[in-house]
Amino acid sequence: MEATFEKMFTVYGGQFGSEGKGQIVRYITGELVNKGRVYAYRIGGPNAGHTFYIGEDKIVTCQIPGPMFLAPSVVGIIGPEGVISPGMLARELQDLVQHRQRTNGGRGFQTLLIDQSAAIITDEQLAREASLVKNIGSTGKGVGAATADKVMRTGKTAKDYDFKTITDKYDLFIDIKIVDTIGWVQKQKNKGPAYAIVEGTQGAGLSLHTSGYYPHCTSRECTPQGIWAGCGLHPGMAKESESVMVIRTYPIRVAGPSGPMTNELTWEEVSRRVGREVKEITTVTKNTRRVSEIDIPELERTIAYTRPDAIALTFLDYVNSDIYKKDPRGNTLSQMYVSSIEQLLDTPVKYVGTGEGYVYQWRV
């Protein structure tokens, strides 16, 4: 059977989320936009935010695929396992339109596909999640409740929801389609070279079934296998496929009773090691994150069942503050640290990040 994509990139978190997936996705997409059509997939919902930078613009998305901000030619896809907060979706579409007006005068019509099976969050589902915030440090955004209702066949999905107030407001810039995204993409496969960039949510250490941290986990699988199923994809649909596991030098978990962390640290200790004051706040809840040393045995376990082709190592500047927002490839300490990670995990490091928006290709 003819391949749908020339190449498919899957970017997923190897720890507990907030590994910097957004900036890696932004970098890879930037390499693709001049090669052909780009389909940018996103699953998950408003309980996970992706942050990246385009020039001076700081972009945060919880619903729409981040690559849509890079070029109007990028087709955004919220997959069948997506969970949608209509209010947040509308705000992010407004951010997208405003960004395009600042950068290219709003020129170019763009397409956002929302799978007809994506779940819709209701006010009642939001209310039901209040106990999860106290018990497991959940963001309480209604994602778990909406997913549970979908499993019980009682939830509302995109095909049941009237998106007219949203589509009418942005129809001069964005064509929003509620469709069977799997079938829609298949029909486009003879229209020239196409690439897929798949933006995973959270991290493998939060996976519902395989993390080993239940009940301190999220409401889905955050592994490549789970992400592909949630998008209606498989690597066999592409002539070439590459999965990139994003990890941090100092992993984090959300605040509160969010589950075990090996060798947990204070931000004061991390700041002392880094040589400058660092403290991170969660994208969605705005609470101070928990932080720890890198956990090699946990990463070895994750690699054993997710089998990434490459690693993206972010927050390398936390190991050596001299490379903050700089190219680290000629730095001896950086080379030593990256080599040690490659040897310990028996996986090549292809990308590194050294600060907000600063990503470099370590290996070709």
Language-model-detected regions and their locations in the chain:
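Non-transmembrane, aqueous-exposed alpha-helical and coiled segments at domain scale
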Residues: 2-364
